[in-house]
Amino acid sequence: MSSFEEYFSKHASEYAKSKSHKSGEDLKSLLTIVNPESSWKVLDMATGTGFTAMAIAPFVSEVIGLDATEEMLSNAVMLSEKSGLRNVKFIKGRVEHSGLEGGSFDLVTCRRAAHHFPDKTAFVVESKRVLKDGGLFALIDMVRPEKDKDNVRNRLEILRDSSHVDAPTVKFWSDLLSKNGFREVETISTKERIAFPDFLSPVNVDSEEGKACLDYLKSISRESLVNADIDPDDLSIIKERVIFLYRKVE
C-alpha cells in the first residue's frame, strides 16, 4: 500500500466528518465561478469522500467521482446515498490514467488533493484528455508562498502527512497549465490564518507526527518562519488556497 493510500485509509472517517471539506468557502467559490449547467457531465478527480462531487451534482446531469483509496470511496458512497443524490457515481482510479473515455466531460474538478500527486504533469495531461474541447478545468489546492525559498511549508506538511508530495507556487501551476493546452479563465486566491492545532488536523498535537512538526518549527530561524507565512511566536499559519479555472484550448 502506498503512503497516500495508507494515510487516507487511516483517516477516511475523519475526512467524511470534515466541515471544511463539506462546506468550505473554497467550495462555495468554485460553484459560483464555474456556474455549472444542467446538461454537463462532470469528473471530480481525487474525490475523497465525495463532498465536491455531491455539491456539484444538483446542478448538472451526471458526476463521476474518482479516487484511488477504497476507504474514501466507501465513505463517499455512504454519504451520497444518505443525501439521496442519484446522478453521482464513484469509481476507483488514478488521476494520472483514469481509464475514462477521452473528450467526454464538460468540467473536470480537483479540490484539496493535488499536493499528494507525484506526477502533476501527468495529472494535468489526463485532465485535458478527458475534457471536451472548450471544457473547463477547475483546480483548488494549497500553494507555497513564493518567498518560502527554504521550502519550510512542504517540509512541515510531509512531517504531518507522509503522503504529501509538494504544494507548489501559483506560478508553477499557471505555467504548467498554460504549457499543456489550457487557457486561464480566472484565478482566485483565499487566505486564512489558522492555529497550529487546526493546521495539524486530523493529526493530533500529541501524536508522533504532531510532535515532529513542533520540533521542526522550533529548530528553524524566525526569518524562515516569516517567509513561510508562519508566526514565530504562536506558530499560527497563513494557509493560502487558490482556485485555478482554466479552459481546454480547442
Question: Could you tell me what each predicted segment is?
Answer:
Residues T109:
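A conserved beta-strand element that flanks and buttresses the S-adenosyl-L-methionine
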Residues T121-L136:
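A short glycine-rich, Lys/Arg-flanked "PGG" loop and its adjoining helix->strand segment in the class I
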Residues L43-H97:
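Class I SAM-dependent methyltransferase SAM/SAH-binding core
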Residues R112-A113:
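Short catalytic micro-motifs in class I SAM-dependent methyltransferases
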Residues D166-G181:
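Short alpha-helix
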Residues M1-W40, F51-A55, E71-N75, L79-S83, A138-D161, ...:
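Conserved class I S-adenosyl-L-methionine
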Residues T49, K120, E184-E250:
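Conserved Class I S-adenosyl-L-methionine
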